[in-house]
Amino acid sequence: MLYLVGFLLATVCLLVLGVNVWVLIDHFLTIDVPPSIPHPVKFRILHFCFHLTTTWGHILEKMNICSMPQFFCFLQDSLSSKENHGVFVKDLRFGTIPVRLFRPKAASSKPRRGILFFHGGGAMIGSLDSHHNLCTFLARETDSVLVSVGYRKLPYYHHPSLYHDCINASIHFLKSLKAYGIDPSRVVICGESIGGAAAVVVTQTLLSRTDIPKIRAQVLIYPILQAFYFQSPSHLMHKNIPFLTKDFMITCICKYLAIDFSWKDAMLTGACISPSAWKKYEKWLSPDNIPKRFRTTYQPPESPAPFNEAAYLETKHAMNIDISPLVADDKIIAQLPEAFLVSLHWDIIRDDVLLYKKRLEDQGVPVTWHHVEDGFHGCILLFDKKLFSFPCSLNIVNAVVSYIKDL
């Protein structure tokens, strides 16, 4: 019996060691670190940890122990140290939606600015806890009342749960500003990654509402703005750069939109875009709209691949504006409030931010653009991680704070 137990333990240890060594060789040693990103060893370590977590998550998912997103979020939240220095924090519910309120402890002689915040994570990972310190920092440094929304996400919830939660929480918040001591003329909506997409969709959706205060400004931190066109320079040139690679991005999109993975290649090559849709969207998505310095080594594809009608029918909902707000009509874009856009040079979705910037500017919407040459997707969450922080992390949070304080 003891021999059997020892054999099983040895087998498990060898399995763990084998998986860890495989991830080390496959990711830590082979990754190409972009030249302008400082601390390449630190970057490799983070990349290794990210893929080690997702690999073990997939293994546990195959064993029916827990899903990959659950495992990732468990580790992410367990390792998150929550700091509340100078800020009162309280967990609440807006109906059934969990939210977290951040309010500066210092007294204020007048109503404060309000911030609605939506966290990132590709609808798979990320939580109120993972973004807690970022929200604390923003609330304290801008002297604002901030509400972070804990929307529903994978593995149990698919589109449109995320956006329904964000919209309903926003309406509840905007109707309750007086209770939180907020100036209704100074409400900012802010989001990171897919949370940035949520911020755009919420702002667009609430434009026609006359019973709630208008959003003062949008703060969009490398937002994911569309989910059907993957042929731009950054999508092709930065497809393997952490922490949002082509494979992880399309996995998140397919799972969230309940699209079968068999259509992945059709989506990535553009075969799912109908000729009529491309005729409408080309003027907004063309690489010609992107500044030349971002496409110097870009080799454009021969437009989208030959049209696949079956793929189109299975994926066409990815073009809806509640998923791809980048392609909303001009009459909607023209009504939007001013925006602060953060783009990252080494981000696969960099060009979507640049295209949205042009769309806003073409319709006369004031835009403040903050481009980070050494930035990579997700870097803002490292701003307080000391040993694992990067210059770009503090660069972004300080720029966001400066912009919000001037509103």
Curated annotation (Swiss-Prot):
Residues 26-407 are lumenal. A motif (Involved in the stabilization of the negatively charged intermediate by the formation of the oxyanion hole) lies at residues 119-121. GO terms for molecular function: hydrolase activity. Gene3D superfamilies: alpha/beta hydrolase. The active site is at S193, D347, H377. SUPFAM superfamilies: alpha/beta-Hydrolases. GO terms for cellular component: membrane. It is found in: Membrane. Keywords: Glycoprotein, Hydrolase, Membrane, Signal-anchor, Transmembrane, Transmembrane helix. It is a single-pass membrane protein. The chain crosses the membrane at residues 5-25. The keyword Membrane applies. This is Arylacetamide deacetylase-like 4 family member 1. It comes from Mus musculus.
